[in-house]
């Protein structure tokens, strides 16, 4: 058996958390449920005002989150976005206060790539010493912007053991890159991953990458998992991206002729943010349960064993 650690991402339950005033589902509910389900760690989106799914921004709240994961024997990762130094220094300290060992980020610069690359290198070089001092690993995600080779170029230039890569199973589709090409380029740097499933569809708003329950899309999720394991990855994170939708950023003529870019059923188009609150919550629960079951089944079929003790 191939031993791994298995995290789950709070994006999977984003509507439960967003509408917590009515669902009663907060970060502590999430931590408790995912521990009971057998995950060995939790990832929490902490973007924006109030730190989103973290559900609080005080020192007391951070301490309570730290205690909640420790009591259940879980590892914790936090997500932020925007590599600017002010944000990164703050979020590294938040991660450390919460007991997180990893902080994910991606760039939010709205500028030509020739400018964004050196700015991102500058930012990550500047914050790396603080992250190292506080024991927080920084991971830069291929998040709808950089191709695999560009991300590898950035991390090569940063040249810090405290700054690695997060590989997303499907985000390269938005920039017209086959996920395996992105994986090959990023492989020497990958420390964390987001496991999800997508289809590419035509919509009235243009070509879109559509999130679907795990196992219902066109991503080669089993082979991707095997390739990542062979590259040394031992911590995987399941992310339910049902009803996620993002535009394809390149002309369709430039899309690779690989199976994950075969056009899917336009009827799958769904933007969860446009659904009524109750419907979003109910359908998210079904998608999460079905997708998580498919993910666990895929792992078992391919010889993976989730270990309760930390693997990496």
Spell out what each predicted region is.
Residues 40-67, 111-112:
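Glycine-rich, proline-tolerant flexible connector loops at the mouths of alpha/beta enzymes
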């Amino acid at each position: 058996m191939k031993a791994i650690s298995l995290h789950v991402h709070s994006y999977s339950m984003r509507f439960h958390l967003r509408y917590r005033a009515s669902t009663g589902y907060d970060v502590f509910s999430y931590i408790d449920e995912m521990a009971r389900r057998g995950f060995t760690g939790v990832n929490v989106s902490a973007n924006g005002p109030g730190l989103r799914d973290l559900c609080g921004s005080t020192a007391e709240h951070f301490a309570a989150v730290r205690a909640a994961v420790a009591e259940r024997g879980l590892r914790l990762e936090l997500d932020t976005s925007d590599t600017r130094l002010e944000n990164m220094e703050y979020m590294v300290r938040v991660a450390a206060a919460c007991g997180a060992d990893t902080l994910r980020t991606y760039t939010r610069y709205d500028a030509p790539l020739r400018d964004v690359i050196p700015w991102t290198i500058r930012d990550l070089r500047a914050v790396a010493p603080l992250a190292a001092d506080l024991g927080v690993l920084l991971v830069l995600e291929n998040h709808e912007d950089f191709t695999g080779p560009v991300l590898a170029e950035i991390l090569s230039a940063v040249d810090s053991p405290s700054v690695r890569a997060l590989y997303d199973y499907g985000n390269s589709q938005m920039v017209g890159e086959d996920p395996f090409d992105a994986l090959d380029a990023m492989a020497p740097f990958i420390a964390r991953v987001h496991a999800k499933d997508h289809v590419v569809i035509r919509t009235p708003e243009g070509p879109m990458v559509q999130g679907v329950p795990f196992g219902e899309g066109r991503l080669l999720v089993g082979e991707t998992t095997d390739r990542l394991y062979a590259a040394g990855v031992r911590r995987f994170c399941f992310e339910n991206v049902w009803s996620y939708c993002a535009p394809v950023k390149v002309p369709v003529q430039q899309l690779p002729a690989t199976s994950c870019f075969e056009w899917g059923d336009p009827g799958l188009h769904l933007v969860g943010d446009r659904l009524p609150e109750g419907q979003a919550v109910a359908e998210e629960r079904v998608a999460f349960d079905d997708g998580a079951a498919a993910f666990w089944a895929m792992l078992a079929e391919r010889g993976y064993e989730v270990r309760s003790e930390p693997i990496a």
